[in-house]
Amino acid sequence: MRIASSIVLTSLAVSGCSRHAPDKMSFFVTSVATGSGGSLGGLAGADAHCQRLAEAAGSRGRQWRAYLSAAAETGQPAVNARDRIGKGPWLNSRGIQIAANLEELHGANNNIGTMTVLPENGQRAPFPHDILTGSNPDGTLAVGDMTCRNWNSTSGYAMFGHSDRQGGRGNAGSWNSAHQSEGCTTAAFRETGGSGLFYCFAAQ
């Protein structure tokens, strides 16, 4: 009986581990925020956060990009989140495809929702559903001050998406353009159900 129990427990452990597929992963939501509200160190800082988390989870040989848009600055054009993330397909941290290409990702038939938006570690632990994007539903830069001063400040505002596509505010069913934040501090994010998390995609 003891041997049989041991075999069962071992099988369950292996089965549990096999569900996490970092070698296939090309999409995740950050498991932790940077801790500085909307001041992420710009797009470069957000990308670096994605890269660190992905590699810590076991992903290798991929270039990770934060799904964030940014406004034009002196000598720099505006940046659309959709233009930063490659062409797809994208799979979550358990190997489930969320979209085949950019059109599907930003259309009605993507596979984004409560059961598929997972952090890089593959765990389904609850997390705040307000996800930073600064974007419109089509993945372009949101109009107005919606990027926390291009992700360099705790001043201004951000556009959130809803990872679970639920809620009673704004365009609640949108994964990338649900509503505006109350500000760009961590405390302001928390007022509507956020903490400063964002989506990461493998661009290659």
Show the residue positions of the predicted features:
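Bacterial N-terminal signal peptides that target proteins for export
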Residues: M1-I7
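Secreted/extracellular ectodomain signature
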Residues: S18-Q204
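C-terminal motif of bacterial Sec signal peptides marking the signal peptidase cleavage site
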Residues: V14-G16
